[in-house]
């Protein structure tokens, strides 16, 4: 039928023959009685659900309209469907007179006015027109009919009307209606045809549009509808009459001036529906089908028009109200009132009629909108109940049957309503109101019926039913998911997932369902919200999103037979590209008449159906990834701008007010004890905060893991649940509450845990049972319910404990049922045994009912239970085994398939033979689908009851709307592993191009999401998998799949380089293998190209800055698929594939990959370089044994260095930290080819890099040239060292002007080269240094490399064996002085000069000479350096301030003499060559000492502050064991004092005298008095005894060993050295004091201190000489040959003392003799002289007794000098000590031993006294 024919149904010609002639097929009908019974059930509500509520009482109301009212109001309380079982049928026989109707459903006058206004606005030409012409004609034909003549009343009524029509043009509708009604009560086909046609035309002209005066009466139109409907009498009704009935009813329902509602509307729809089903003519069926569609559209279009009108009207009123400042709240119900008036079952029980409710209800309850809403509700409910009619198994595939056509028609109408009028259903403000309950949205009122309709039909194996049911589900999922949150979970988990996973479901079902999943995957919003509302919500909710992806991945991974490459699908064979399998479009309802519907009977299986299903699954996965990435790139409004109103519309499923305002904090945190607290707060997650949802997901995962642990080890699982706060506390109550309310627990494990015999488990079990309720439940049902909570363990003691507690609980809940708990216990135990006996396959002789009764005799406290009760129990157990639902046989409890009932053994054999031609898969699915449907229906009932009990809105009912892209990250992390497995399978096993392309597309899309969120673990897994499938390690097995994988890998790498991170290693390793394949294809021997991925040499570790551990990668198992697949390709094709790897496209892609590194970010280029370094090192390591090692990646490193050289310094420094380290390592490689290549590449790169200007104080060049330095220091190959120097030389010559910080590295390299003992390398280094010294010194100075230059030249100046070059280096330094002066002058001009800066230049310069002086091997070089140094100091003495001179003296001068600070033994240990050290000390050091002292001596006025340092240095020299050094030191000391005696100040003299004191103390042999060095000697022994025994061996034996003796011998030698130094020092002082005017320059007070110093040495010598015991010990020790003495020191000290004292006294002559100072000094000197005279006299007397000859010879000059000094005193001085001197002279004479000189002196003295 064409669209034009459908649109003109309401205008069918009045001649029924015209329509009759268009009939297409006329079938043989069933018997009339059968059809009537079937039709009467089509809309009968009593058969909707086969159960009836036990709690609701039936309400007897005769009025059919009130029954419809009750149907609506009963649904407002959201009762489950079983509570509506007693409602009256919307289909009833219209018997009796219409006047007896007590209640009217006509519209109120005000509503009629509104509707007329609306109708007039839409149709200005509508209204009452004069129908005289066709009425007269109709009545004329009626009067001529034969039937009219047989009915007197009818004939009279017709005649009356004809007469009245002749009198007046217009008659009242009641007048015309009466004969028409009478005509319809006849059985005349002619009369019925004419009458119905007349009705239709009158309705078109709105003739019956007359409101009744009494609102309780029915309208004329309603009477007309009843009359028209009564004309249909089943299939026996003539087809012409049926067509006219359809036309008339359609005109009535679609009338724009009147509204047919409630039972009258349903009556019209019912009769049209019956005609559609029962009519034999296919054309009439088609017309009836279109009429039904237009009736439905009329109802909802009228409702839509009224809703739009009222919204506009309310908007105007709101604007007026807001302008007046007073909002209109009259129509807003008070919440407290609404809660009080909530409709309940009890209110129905006490309600007498709806009249009182109507009278008390507000006026708005009777509004037109509410009336139309009730019509819509009743219509949808009726269609839903029609769709769930059960169809016998054998008739399910007969699509032409009336029951199947009825089901399909109802489903299509439901789909049409949902699709077309979704705006009405999805509007939460469209609410059905009731005076006794809160307003209920229309969608909530019809939701339960739609769900039940889907549950019954979506499991159907009849494909048209299944597909239209899936389409309805899709509309709900896409548009109404916020209203069906809990219901959608049931559909997914109980129906759709099982269908996809079942083997018995057909491929057609799977492809239809995959189409729905594909649409779901294409909508990002739907996917995200599925994840938020199911996967992230804790509790028992299924992970819908995750399971959907896992299921799709599993289907995609299934093995199928792929079509051969030559196979091409026709359009009708490729079903995956079509929107539906049966219905290619659902924009219009398909023709369901009996002639056309047969085309759906034979479902076809297109070729390679499994393959197409697999393709569809891949498309679903790809759509999922595409949707996720699309969602990532969307822009969302800021969450903070969401208002409370937004939350109301976007965060809740039922339009309720949010439970908390935004200012209030959530009631519970994520980590609280129970997650229900968080979800029960409607506002807690209203804004879908990603972090909170991530925590929720984590929390749910924790719960699932804990449950899994419980199912494995229950006690450990309980511990985890407690620690994670899923169980509030350790109390048995809390644990039992969790166990009984949590799904997913293994019931067998739970039974074992609860049955444990310890006290804790028993307490938990008791609490577990106490949480159950058995109130008013039969005993067997209670026991069955009890045993559904867990699996009863097999141990008898455990069973006993369970039964005891059950009996106790049952008796508590049902007092009086049994006499005591023992009865319940015994009976329960008996039933358990009976259940086992009747249903265990091991039991052969089963218990009979009499046996069971006998076993239970006297169990009720001695009394018997009734036999009927026990028989009922037995039969119940026999029919229905007590078994866990999860373990129940899926074939049980379902309608038996015909021919499969329990038969005998022989009959079963016959049936087995009979199944040969049966569809066993279909039968298995039929049983499984029935189970799914029943279970789903039960879940919906429980769900609705639960919602009613806990309130309309709870935490789990809140529907969260996605607003954040951050949700995508955890979504992908939850499913990436099955997705990866699915996409890997075709690449691994398939050769089908479509599958491979889909897989690679999946990889691309997955990587988009991965890179967007920078997920490490998935990235590594996907990239490693993709690189693995390039299969480049085996060129003989390459396939086109591998080529495509490589191209995809390159595309991903080019597009997402910044995000690859560690995966760059896999990509670059693959490119390295690609280069190997290209070389092989070019003819290179494969043996000379080792594969990096397969060769595993002994790896050398990279530097830790380069190498990082890579964790989290997933290694995929190697499969033999490549080997098996390779057998299908010929050798020629393999060669062709290998050549393709060298194609221009691949080569350009690889080149672009490296050239595009300049576009990578800072982190991206860092990761790229790091990975390329690792690959390069692996290439090198795997090809060490080859003559030409692989250097591909090393070359690429140089390339990318060129590309990225111009990056900002921060990025380049990061890159070079890797490159520099790697080039440093490679340049020292043991393979010279590799090292040379690295250095040469680095040289070329350096030439480019040095072109870039470097600013001051940066060190990029220094770091860049560091690999050269490392190669010079660490390479063992002299050729590499020579290459380094040549590279440096070339860089200097070409880029010296641009070198800044690089000079430091260059000079460091050259300095190190000076240590190499190779002539060629040394000559090259010398050449470079010479060139620098003569050509580029000024450039180096300006570039800040001055110190490094000096250090370099200094090291070359110290070379051994090349005197000429070393002298030239000293000259370079000398010339550098002039350049330095110029540079400093330039700095002064540039205003960057400072004194400190100048000194920073001078000090390194001076220190370089110090280094040469101390370390140069050639004496002439050292001497020249020494001369240049001191010449420079003389020239610039005035330029240096005192502080800098201090620095110079300490670091550049005094450090030369640092060797003097160590002992001889240390010197011998430290010096490499003792002889050279001695020579250096006697030559260079002595020369340096003289130069230093000479410097201070000549510049003393400028350098007087260095006097203490100079004296300290001289002290060290004088105290050396080397006599030459000591003498030089004494000479320098003497000359220094003499030279500057006139410039010394008092403080200087203090330093000098202190120095003299220090020298005398240091050279004083105090060790002579250490008794531990010598053996004990008897004090009574004479000198002769000592001499006699001094060399006896046995006297020496007291020493412990010869080594001890040698040690003491050496110690004595040091004592002798001290004695010698003491004499030298005294002689030096003697000569110094005898110099001209020496003593006169020393202050007299200082001389007193000097005398005390001299006397200390004198007294020590005198004391030693007087100690015979010590001297004897020394002699007896054998370490000396003669008796030791210190006569020379004693005599010289005495002589020097007297000379000094008398000279000081003599110098006082010129002073004033009267001054006090003079007298004090004279007294001091005289006293000292007198005491000293006594000391010398005592010594003279001692030597006369000990050794007269030698002693007298030593003391006589001293005595003579003393007497001579006395004689030299002037008279005043002589007279002051005259008496003391006289006594001294007398004592001398008394001693005797007076020689001529002494005698002469004494004579002169006495003569002076005589005078």
UniProtKB/Swiss-Prot annotation:
<feature type="binding site">
    <location>
        <position position="812"/>
    </location>
    <ligand>
        <name>Mg(2+)</name>
    </ligand>
</feature>
<feature type="compositionally biased region" description="Polar residues">
    <location>
        <begin position="669"/>
        <end position="688"/>
    </location>
</feature>
<keyword id="KW-0479">Metal-binding</keyword>
<feature type="compositionally biased region" description="Basic and acidic residues">
    <location>
        <begin position="57"/>
        <end position="73"/>
    </location>
</feature>
<feature type="modified residue" description="Phosphothreonine">
    <location>
        <position position="742"/>
    </location>
</feature>
<dbReference type="GO" id="GO:0006886">
    <property type="term" value="P:intracellular protein transport"/>
</dbReference>
<dbReference type="InterPro" id="IPR000904">
    <property type="entry name" value="Sec7_dom"/>
</dbReference>
<dbReference type="GO" id="GO:0012507">
    <property type="term" value="C:ER to Golgi transport vesicle membrane"/>
</dbReference>
<feature type="modified residue" description="Phosphoserine">
    <location>
        <position position="741"/>
    </location>
</feature>
<dbReference type="InterPro" id="IPR023394">
    <property type="entry name" value="Sec7_C_sf"/>
</dbReference>
<feature type="region of interest" description="Disordered">
    <location>
        <begin position="1"/>
        <end position="108"/>
    </location>
</feature>
<dbReference type="GO" id="GO:0005794">
    <property type="term" value="C:Golgi apparatus"/>
</dbReference>
<keyword id="KW-0460">Magnesium</keyword>
<keyword id="KW-0597">Phosphoprotein</keyword>
<feature type="compositionally biased region" description="Basic and acidic residues">
    <location>
        <begin position="80"/>
        <end position="91"/>
    </location>
</feature>
<dbReference type="InterPro" id="IPR032629">
    <property type="entry name" value="DCB_dom"/>
</dbReference>
<comment type="function">
    <text>Guanine exchange factor that acts as an activator of arf1 at the trans-Golgi net-work and is thus involved in vesicular budding and traffic between compartments of the Golgi apparatus. Activation of Arf (ADP-ribosylation factor) GTPases is essential for vesicle formation via recruitment of cargo adapters and coat proteins necessary for Golgi trafficking. Involved in tunicamycin-induced ER stress response and subsequent apoptosis.</text>
</comment>
<feature type="modified residue" description="Phosphoserine">
    <location>
        <position position="332"/>
    </location>
</feature>
<dbReference type="InterPro" id="IPR046455">
    <property type="entry name" value="Sec7/BIG1-like_C"/>
</dbReference>
<feature type="modified residue" description="Phosphoserine">
    <location>
        <position position="40"/>
    </location>
</feature>
<keyword id="KW-0472">Membrane</keyword>
<dbReference type="InterPro" id="IPR016024">
    <property type="entry name" value="ARM-type_fold"/>
</dbReference>
<keyword id="KW-0968">Cytoplasmic vesicle</keyword>
<feature type="short sequence motif" description="HUS box">
    <location>
        <begin position="533"/>
        <end position="537"/>
    </location>
</feature>
<protein>
    <recommendedName>
        <fullName>ADP-ribosylation factor guanine nucleotide-exchange factor sec71</fullName>
    </recommendedName>
</protein>
<feature type="domain" description="SEC7">
    <location>
        <begin position="692"/>
        <end position="880"/>
    </location>
</feature>
<feature type="region of interest" description="HDS1 domain">
    <location>
        <begin position="889"/>
        <end position="1103"/>
    </location>
</feature>
<dbReference type="InterPro" id="IPR035999">
    <property type="entry name" value="Sec7_dom_sf"/>
</dbReference>
<dbReference type="Pfam" id="PF09324">
    <property type="entry name" value="Sec7-like_HDS"/>
</dbReference>
<dbReference type="GO" id="GO:0006888">
    <property type="term" value="P:endoplasmic reticulum to Golgi vesicle-mediated transport"/>
</dbReference>
<keyword id="KW-0813">Transport</keyword>
<dbReference type="GO" id="GO:0030663">
    <property type="term" value="C:COPI-coated vesicle membrane"/>
</dbReference>
<keyword id="KW-0653">Protein transport</keyword>
<dbReference type="InterPro" id="IPR032691">
    <property type="entry name" value="Mon2/Sec7/BIG1-like_HUS"/>
</dbReference>
<dbReference type="Pfam" id="PF16213">
    <property type="entry name" value="DCB"/>
</dbReference>
<dbReference type="InterPro" id="IPR015403">
    <property type="entry name" value="Mon2/Sec7/BIG1-like_HDS"/>
</dbReference>
<dbReference type="GO" id="GO:0046872">
    <property type="term" value="F:metal ion binding"/>
</dbReference>
<keyword id="KW-0333">Golgi apparatus</keyword>
<dbReference type="Pfam" id="PF12783">
    <property type="entry name" value="Sec7-like_HUS"/>
</dbReference>
<feature type="modified residue" description="Phosphothreonine">
    <location>
        <position position="326"/>
    </location>
</feature>
<dbReference type="Pfam" id="PF20252">
    <property type="entry name" value="BIG2_C"/>
</dbReference>
<feature type="modified residue" description="Phosphoserine">
    <location>
        <position position="353"/>
    </location>
</feature>
